[in-house]
Amino acid sequence: MIARAMTKEDVPACTAILNHTVALGGSTAQEEPMTEEEFAQDHLVEALICNVVEVDGRIAGFQGVWPAGEGLYSIGSFTDRREPVPGAGRVLFEKLLNDCRPRGGEAILAKITSDNIGGLAYYSKMGFADFEIWPDDHQRPDGRKVDRIVKRFPL
């Protein structure tokens, strides 16, 4: 299992992972599927860093950070839920830390909807600490409002 920088060749596989997660519902604030063009713009152009984890030539997940204010990064992480690979998230985060630290900055923020139990557990396991709660910050397609939990990882 290796983590490396995302390339344009990875976009179809990563878009499929994202869109499958969106279709399952309840584990991301992303509610609408993305086209490959939208995904490439967001992850290859707007993201400061974006990596993939590859297992036997197959993309098993991706992770990136975007600017979130002075000295802060906002993280987004997705792993393939059709064929999960244990440890993929940890390998991605180790690579991301190695890429972020030389850039400087104070912290990485993870902004997770309160109904995303898996995401909350993942970021806690990676060492993120609870930082803020944004009440009723996100509305699900069925009209339910959920809090956003902000977790912080100091760099």
What is each model feature region?
Residues 14, 18, 39:
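Hydrophobic pocket/interface hotspot
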Residues 100-112:
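Conserved GNAT acetyl-CoA-binding A-motif
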Residues 1-14:
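A short beta-loop-alpha structural element at the N-terminal edge
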Residues 8, 24-84, 93-94, 99, ...:
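Acetyl-CoA-dependent GNAT
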Residues 2, 74-78, 109-111, 150-152:
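Short aromatic/hydrophobic contact patches that present stacked aromatics
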Residues 35, 57, 114-115, 137-138:
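Conserved beta-strand edge residues that scaffold enzyme active sites
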Residues 67, 109-113, 124, 129-146:
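Conserved catalytic-core motifs of GNAT/GCN5-like acyltransferases
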Residues 87:
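Glycine-rich phosphate-binding loop
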